[in-house]
Amino acid sequence: MTKKIISLLMIFATLLIITLVSYFHYNQLPIYDINLASKFILNEQTNNDFDEISEILGFDSTDKLLIIHADDLGLCESVNSATFESFENEAISSASVMMTTKEISEVSEFSSKNQNYDLGIHLTVTSEWKYHKWGGILNNEDISSILNKKNHFYWNKRKFTKNGKLNEIRKELQAQVDLGRSMGLNPSHIDSHEGALFFDPDIFKLYLRIAEENDLLAFVPSQASVHFDQNFKKPKHAIIIDQFHMLPEGTEINQIKDYYFNVIENLSPGLSQIIVHLGKDEKELREITIDHPNFDYRWRQLDYDIFNSDEFKNHLKKHDIKIINWKDLKKLI
């Protein structure tokens, strides 16, 4: 009887492990730490003290504070022009810049003429597009653990997480921050392209250390706050976004507008961020996003159209949304 129970428990444990591995693999979540995986499954998130945040920023604790943030600035001319225009139209309040791409000189020029706009560094360690590839800022031999045989970043987060050496990751992340500043950017914060830096405990701590050493804020989506516990307290430079929204992969084109409007209708008091991916339906962007329906040219054109529309801006006013940016949040440190 005892042997039978032990056998059943072993079978159950094996099935549980297989289920967890399959779940994280299917959702492209490279979490290989058992403790972190359990906290993620149990949703053991750390929350902000919003009463303190709202007081420092000059708002009431009942206010709905929202950052409208554009990712991937620098990806190409189409993304750049869409983002620049969205800043000018007050359709977005913040954006972050990929330093590994060819079109960042446009961003540098724009920033030099528009120092009031809020920019961050979009720390990039993956290269997801089918043909449009990039590697790191540093020499290939200095960061070989995070490059494939063609000296491009790996195309997915799993390979980066499994192969990356911490010392090489640290050097590359610092180089990206340094390049941004050398080009005249005055970043307020860092975040992570494809969230690649959020899943491994040591890499996540490194990400936060880069923020602290450079006096920058670190974007931490609520899902990643499971890293924090009694043994690892949240550092002051880490800003947890309690309500984090980004268009889910697989969303049908005809559902995109409803998704964003529903997000606004259902925002609760507190600190929120919507991440958008802006672009224009042009030949360049179509070629970059080929065979990649998520975040492709159609998504990006719709993001641009929706957030620049009077209808959406009126929707924000109707629900009394207070728009802020990452520069505002620097008051917290």
Task: Please state what every model-predicted region is.
Residues A218-P221, H292-I333:
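C-terminal domain-boundary segment and adjacent tail
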Residues K165-F244, P248-K257, E265, D305:
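Catalytic domains of cell-wall/extracellular-matrix polysaccharide-remodeling enzymes
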Residues D51-K130:
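Active-site beta->alpha N-cap acidic-glycine motif
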Residues I56-G58, T83-N89, I104-D118, G135-N148, ...:
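Acidic (Asp/Glu)-rich catalytic clusters
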Residues W134-K159, I290-D296:
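Active-site gating loops and adjacent loop-to-helix segments of metal-dependent hydrolytic enzymes
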Residues K3-I67:
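N-terminal pre-catalytic segment of deacetylase/amide-hydrolase enzymes
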Residues L73, T100, H122-E128, H193-G195, ...:
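Active-site beta-loop-alpha junctions enriched in small/polar residues
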Residues L65-I67, I92-S96, N116-H122, P187-D191, ...:
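Structural preference for beta-strand elements that scaffold enzyme active sites
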